[in-house]
Amino acid sequence: MPTILVINPNSSTFITTSMEEKLVPLVPSDVKLRFLTCPQPGAAVIDSITEATLTAALVFQALTPSVLDGVDAIAVACYSPTPLVDMIRESFALPCMGIVQASVLSALSVGQRIGILTSTYRSECLLYELLDSFGVSRTRVAAIASTGRTVLQLSQMPSQERETLLVQKAQELANTKGADVICLGGAALAAIRDQIQVAVGPNIPIIDGVHAAVELLAGLARQNLHTSKFGIYTYP
């Protein structure tokens, strides 16, 4: 029975709760989930390189032996570039995956041209760089669409207004940009995955990166695979 630690690298417990409520009914019964939220004084949301770096340090310090006891793999639920994934891979043998990588790996397996729905234009720019670092050709990326609002601003919008905005952006990715698979850029966006699926139709897969990461990591754990300790991830 693989045990996956799902890390919310910001300090907003409502996001952790939302992830837990969404994930638990979806994962197989033989997969156990644990959750960790960034300790205070971590940022409430991550919308910048600085916030990603500072929260990574706080979360890393919280990964004590007691927290990691019995854990088989770690998912980092941040849809922005964060040093936390590489920090964990370098310091532990446990498989670790960020939700950007998980969603893109899944998308490349079921579609030809990826669309990503994200929060701000800054996130859009950072994601293009991150995809380049994964070796994903720009020809496989239909577009990255931003809402023009931070994660915190999105969370504070009336639910119907937020849903309308996100659905509209997803439809643009599919109908205007030619995306044949869409990744939801953040744990907060996954709450309306079903509504987006209805809006774009059944032929276009909608990928929740957190769910994708848990499923991929459970598979790695079942294969008894660990992070390579030869090369870049040699122990410090």
Curated annotation (Swiss-Prot):
One of its GO terms (molecular function) is amino-acid racemase activity. InterPro entries: Asp/Glu/hydantoin_racemase, Hydantoin_racemase-like, Iso_Racemase_Enz_sf. Its main location: cytoplasm. Keywords: Cytoplasm. The keyword Cytoplasm applies. It holds the Pfam family Asp_Glu_race. GO terms for cellular component: cytoplasm. Coiled coil: none annotated. It is found in: Cytoplasm. Belongs to the HyuE racemase family. This is Uncharacterized protein C576.02. It comes from Schizosaccharomyces pombe (strain 972 / ATCC 24843).
